[in-house]
Amino acid sequence: MRLRLRLAPGQEPADVAASAERLRHAWGVHAVYVSEIKPGVVELRLVGFDVLRKVRMPRRTTADFLKVPVALREDSTACVRDYRAIPHQLTLGATLSGKSMYLRHLVVGLAPQRVALVGIDCKRGVELAPFAPRLSALATDPAQAAELLPVLVQLMEDRYDLIKARQGIAPSTPDEEITSDIWGLPDAERPAPVVLFVDEVAELFLVATRKEEDRRDEMVTQLIRLAQLGRAAGIYLEVCGQRFGAELGKGATMLRAQLTGRVCHRVNDEASAKMALADIAPEAVGAACAIAPERPGLAVVGDTSGGWSRIRTPYLSLSDAAAVCAETAGLVPVVPALDPFRPAMPVQPADQPVPPLPVSD
């Protein structure tokens, strides 16, 4: 239920928000959420029960280009992952916290769109390999990732050259044709956006020898470059892991600072929650630490505006997600630079023996 209130002179939305707990008890509802609609008007959203106990996504929720409904917020609205608004995101969570479920929903939501999906799965591909028919590239260990990341950086630089060539501004060029990113390019010239999924990012930082340390430094530098410059080139990062902080090594905190979106599932210690949320929404750290193990998929999402909320991802089986990727395999965009990294498709055995072809003269 929604109510809109016009504020009295001298009131501000914070005054109404401070009364939300009293209103909840007065009206006998589960929660009351207050949001500002416009100057002088606030909206009260009344929720009668805990909608995160059994997740049902809103019926009117529809996906849009680079916008994926992935979870339900505690105020009963959909949590939408908007890559145009928040290009890069860090998702943390312990084992069995629901982090993989969140990742599945992202892949399934992007699969029907004209988007190149690229994966770096440091668990030998067990998380992303089932989605291989829809992936443009897949690396399953740090060695393969070290080969893939330079290609993505070069792809980004090539796209900047394309944008720069378009900016050869002549006096007769209309203002609307001047652009600083791929979205200002004509449809016929605009390359497909790329979403890079990195699962278990900490594995990219682990080293045992001097040679591996040099490789690690190169990979981290390339990830930072993609995070800093990739948005205008249509390259977006989705970085997942169990822990992510300064103890991983050089460049970890610099990379984390570029990941604007934050999602924190259940974690094993308070330090992990602080890694995800303390620098953008400090008050959300306690909420993340309070997530119970028996509620997988529950998480806290925050952004650099300081706002945060609890969300929960609905259940999606791996087989259903893989089926969607198989059905949309024909939608993989053409990105020649990524062809060497395209995962091989398993050959399905024939139901009956195939007759041999006649030998011609």
What are these regions (language model features)?
Residues 1-88, 92-97:
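Primarily NTPase-proximal linker/entry elements flanking Walker-type ATP/GTP-binding cores
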Residues 14-22, 33-44, 50-60, 233, ...:
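Conserved ATP-driven motor cores of ASCE-family P-loop NTPases powering translocation/secretion/packaging/pilus
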Residues 169-193:
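Mid-core helix/loop region of P-loop NTP-binding domains shared across ATPases and GTPases
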Residues 58-169, 191-277, 281-285, 319, ...:
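P-loop NTPase catalytic phosphate-binding loop
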Residues 37, 74, 180-184, 189, ...:
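Short coil/turn motifs at beta-sheet boundaries
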